[in-house]
A protein has these predicted regions:
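Conserved FAD-binding catalytic core of PHBH/FMO-like flavoproteins
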Residues: 162-163, 183-184, 188, 194-360
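C-terminal helical "tail/cap" subdomain of flavin- and related membrane-associated enzymes
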Residues: 2-11, 15, 22-34, 38-66, ...
């Protein structure tokens, strides 16, 4: 499928699975009859034993929509303001835009607010790797990512260039891979993914730019009244449901539960990121720059990770332990200081010094790494019409590559939850959106993401310790589970 097909295709939810991508398949008739016989015999015997257990429905992928939850349509569904709540999405990053797309496909009314004045107003991060969220992209109507790159090999080196670990499809199969293997990670820049999602909405005009959230007030039976600052003036807007998708320093979260309850937690290291066009290397070549290899180099303290960023550039991520004060100071000194520190620490095997030197300071950023304590669902129970997704709900370190993946899964899960909980005749307006949708959604989201937050925090210690130097063809994260640090 070409990019144009992604843009022009309209989608609506699959009538077979109601947009879930899976169906409950009834147990076979023989199994049901057996249960009926067993339960009659049990009741007749009048014993104190354990009663027979009814066979549960078997959940299967929906074949009608290839498990995406969507089917092609001549047009998007008509917005259903009668049955669905109007959703105010705060934050136009990946999670917020993904939620807007999922609402569009379901006829759920929404408005997407972003504090930035434009799409390119500030850096939206560098590259990311779609892991389990690759399948979720189908559920957002994106069947292919034109700017996505597929890696087939992952290599870990010592600073001298000795390979201590290697894994991936190329390693396993020892054959030349297809251009788009079915089961592999997809590397893409954050802005490219964000743009692909925005194109589903029709482009930049789908976002209310320049809207800085100042506060909100939940009103009994009247939803939520939000206050924004727009071009220096105050603006009041009403919504039935507010979703904070505004990142690790979420204004919605701060207003909802306060900054002191679950403050930012420093994880003891700094990350420096850069993008290097291959043409800047002026003819220097390396087999590690073949566009399908991800590699990292470690020494037990510093660690650099490099992956394809585009067909003609690579992204690198350098990290090392540092006090919070030192990390803040270095970050505030700006790109040139970050580059100098990075170059000083990475006089290692080729092509690392060459790439570091060839990366323009304008393409470098760096920041201390934070997360937060796992969110207790009880902190949200009194928020009748407000919830959080993505980094606003469960921020994590970047070392497991799960932040964007979890945000995409959150967005799709919430839209599906609204479709189910606010369906016609559900009487959600009487029960409230929390009881009808949010409590179940938040429980699933926080349970799913908890291990990702925990593993991402533990990876900080693992990847910057001597245990990472142990040889073995496995991901570095697995060593944390199977070996003592």
């Amino acid at each position: 499928m070409k990019k144009a097909e992604n843009e022009e295709a309209c989608w609506t939810i699959c009538p077979e699975c109601k947009g879930r991508g899976k169906i409950n398949q009834r147990s076979r008739k023989k199994v049901r009859l057996r249960y009926q016989i067993e339960i009659k015999e049990f009741e007749k015997a009048q014993t104190d034993g354990v009663a027979p257990v009814r066979a549960e429905s078997n959940i299967q992928p929906c074949l009608s929509c290839n498990a995406s939850g969507l089917i092609r349509s001549a047009s998007y569904p008509i917005v259903d303001t009668e049955n669905y709540p109007h959703v105010a999405i705060i934050g136009g990053g990946i999670g917020g835009v993904a939620l807007a797309v999922a609402c569009l496909h379901r006829g759920i009314p929404f408005t997407l607010y972003e504090r930035d004045n434009s799409f390119d107003a500030r850096s939206q991060g560098y590259g990311l790797t779609l892991q389990q969220a690759s399948n979720a992209m189908k559920g957002l109507g994106i069947l292919t990512l034109e700017q996505g790159l597929y890696s087939t090999n992952h290599v870990v080196h010592t600073t001298e260039g000795t390979v201590i670990s290697e894994w991936g499809m190329r390693k396993r199969m020892h054959t030349e891979m297809k251009a788009n293997p079915k089961r592999t990670n997809v590397h893409i820049s954050r802005q490219s993914l964000r743009l692909a999602l925005l194109e589903q909405l029709g482009g930049f005009d789908a976002v209310q730019w320049g809207h800085q959230l100042i506060g909100f007030n939940e009103r009994a039976s009247e939803g939520v009244e939000l206050s924004f600052q727009v071009n220096g003036e105050m603006k009041s807007i009403k919504a039935d449901l507010v979703v904070g998708a505004d990142g690790i320093r979420s204004a919605v979260r701060s207003l909802l539960i306060g900054d002191d309850v679950t403050p930012l937690r420093y994880l003891g290291c700094i990350v420096i990121l850069g993008i290097c066009p291959l043409e800047n290397l002026k003819g220097f070549d390396s087999h590690l720059l073949d566009g399908a290899t991800v590699f990292q180099t470690v020494n037990g303290n510093e660690r650099i990770y490099m992956m394809p960023y585009s067909t003609d550039s690579v992204m690198w991520q350098l990290s090392f332990p540092m006090s919070e004060k030192e990390a803040k100071d270095l970050s505030e000194q700006g790109p040139q200081a970050l580059k100098e520190e990075g170059c000083r620490r990475t006089q290692w095997h080729d092509p690392i010094p060459q790439i570091m030197a060839a990366t323009l300071a304008a393409q470098i950023t760096g920041y201390p790494v934070y997360d937060r304590e796992l969110l207790d669902p009880k902190l949200l129970k009194n928020a009748r019409c407000v919830t959080l997704i993505g980094d606003a709900a469960h921020p994590m370190s970047p070392f497991k590559g799960q932040g964007a993946n979890q945000a995409l899964l959150d967005a799709l899960a919430l839209a599906r939850g609204i479709t189910k909980g606010c369906r016609p005749l559900s009487q959600w307006k009487d029960a409230g959106v929390r009881q009808s949708v949010l409590t179940e959604f938040e429980s699933e989201m926080l349970e799913r993401s908890a291990s990702k937050v925990k593993d991402s925090a533990e990876a900080v210690e693992l990847l910057h310790s001597k245990v990472v130097l142990r040889e073995g063809n496995e991901t570095r994260g697995r060593g944390l589970k199977s070996k003592d640090i």
